[in-house]
Amino acid sequence: MIALSVIILASCTSKPEQKNENKTETPNPFLTEYTTPFQVPPFDQIKNEHYLPAFEAGIAEQQTEVEAIVNNKETPTFENTILPFDKSGKILSRVRNVFFNLNECLTNDEMVAIAEQVLPMLSKHSDAIMMNPKLFERIDYVYQHRNEMGLDDQQIRVVEKYHQDFVRSGAGLTKEQQAELSQINEQLSTLSLQFGNNLLKENANYKLVIDKDWNLAGLPQTSIDAAAEQAKNDGMEGKWVFTLSKPSLIPFLQFANNRHLRKQLYEAYYNRGDNNNEYDNKSLIKQMLELRLKKAQLFGYENFADYVLAVNMAQDSKTVDKFLIDIFKPAQELAKKELAEMQEIAYKECENAENEAIEVQGYDWWYYAEKLRKAKYDFDENYIKPYLTVDNVRNGMFMAANKLYGITFTQNTNLPIYYPDVETYEVKEANGDFLGILYLDYYPRESKSGGAWCTSFRESGHDINGKKIYPVISLVMNFTPASGDTPALLTWDETETMWHEFGHSLHAFFSDGLYSRTCGNVPHDYVEMPSQIMENWVAEPEVIRMYAKHYKTGEVMPDSLITKIENSALFNQGLMTTELIAASILDMKYHEITSIDEIKNLDVDAFEKQQMDAIGLIPQILPRYRSTNFAHIFNGGYSAGYYAYTWAEVLDKDAFNYFKSSGDLFNPELAASFRKNCLQECGNDEGMVQYRKFRGQNPDNEPYLKARGLK
């Protein structure tokens, strides 16, 4: 996942910073250019007290910049209107990038309170700019005369995109409609933050505490050790604590023999935000859906989905609906076959143990799927984990990027970091030219949101004088840390996750352009393609041999294990695809509602069940996210956009097949073309136009269908 519009998630578990009334005021680092190496954020100097004044100063600065544009008496041109607007808001960008990123991965009560204060300020500020009639008048003038001003193609695209932004932000509405829209935007920002805060509280508040070691039967030692460490950290030494974070949750569902405890953990995870307590999200969902529909209707759209999709590759909801259901049907048929095979294993186990037969349920799926993988492919995840240390996987992705693009990654331990175990790397071209800085933040902590994402402390671009601005990118994960003498070991899924987020970082490093509006900016249903394509290289035998080495012996992963990884590539794809598409359909159905009254009368749980019943989702499978914990769409910028992961996967599978069919996984000509057309210049034209420049044709969906086991 990439934080395009930074996802505002926060945890309230850390103690707020204690204020000292006698302390000496320190200079606010956000108010001047950073003086650190490579101008990375001076994390060692930043204090909570700096944020609010910096936001206020940033808003004031950009207001002054906009006023200067508006008050210019000269005829509007690209140079006196579009360019200065494109480069405005430096202070605001500086503080926003740091604050909201740290609020996701190193938050505390004081930062949560600041976010609650700042979000309405930012919403009002944005609306004041985007609905400024005099500013829009100047932008509209340039837009209407863009073909007569001698502008180049990129300048014309920048003008067109800004004009589109202003129109979609309410510049063409009446004053009464603008006032309503401003109120809607402010409310949505607050509700979204609250949804995320509730989810973090739900995550943090649940712990499965085990005090009898026989309840650990079946679990790998690494999971047991991690649970013991968690218990120790929670003041329960001698016990074992399992949480709802994926590194704790998934192994328990895969390997724990205690079915009752598997059910407890499974239900706790899927019921987050739906417990009818102070952190319940159902009311927030209804409020957001109503506000989003009102917003869409202000712009003349029948529903919010069509408003969102109008600027995406898919264009409209009907296209997305057909795309999703055409995949869902064969995916669920595959899932039913997987279920039948697992049920057979369950029956045999019960028969051998002379126990009453069980029917496989959702909380059994991962457990019996693991047994099925062992039976069909002789594949045990615990056999490969010793080869997949965090360091090995990281070095492998660096080597792959070097073979593709010639770039290098050199660790620099002298840069400011925001947490002790964060790593920093200088990224350079093959000729030594500087590309940017990469931060790697691997491990969970109480103050950090769950999941994995790529975000930026500074975006690539150029300043108003044409000077290059180098990106500062961060990959944030939640992997199980080292324990005792055992280093941090990754599952195969976590290995793919790291390479996925790394793909986002390559997109960020390579994106280049003179103008902020188009540099690296792509539609939502394109943005996951640069990340997902890297997941294809990670599983190739040639590549596995580059990085998978046993942490004790240094031995390269043997071919027998690599073959098992290859043979099990389609393992559990029925479930994985079905739950993903089901969640995407649920997202669309929420945002295709056309009636305010329907939303007011909505029962969230009943609506979810109704939509899943309508597509025939089998009861053993839930959508990947249930409504009340679907942060992507209610807290993360993917509303009416979760389908984008699948849409982009069709592109990435086709693109990788192009590499593979060339006979060289690291084909230098194809790599150069992919970098230029799909990463570097991706914002220069529409997504499919840029893709065709690389591929020479529209994407073929055959590679996707084969990779998912659907053909």
Task: Go through the PLM ranges and name each one.
Residues 35-50, 99-118, 141-183, 243-283, ...:
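Short His/Asp/Glu-rich catalytic/ion-coordination signatures at enzyme active sites or charged loops
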Residues 154, 158, 190, 197, ...:
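Active-site-proximal, well-structured secondary-structure segments within enzyme catalytic domains
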Residues 20-220:
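N-terminal helix-rich structural modules
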Residues 480-499:
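Short pre-active-site segment immediately N-terminal to the catalytic Zn-binding motif
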Residues 20-50, 57, 239-241, 392, ...:
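C-terminal, non-catalytic "cap/extension" segments appended to globular domains
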Residues 13-15:
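Bacterial signal peptide processing site
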Residues 8-11:
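C-terminal motif of bacterial Sec signal peptides marking the signal peptidase cleavage site
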Residues 1-3:
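Sec-dependent signal peptide recognition
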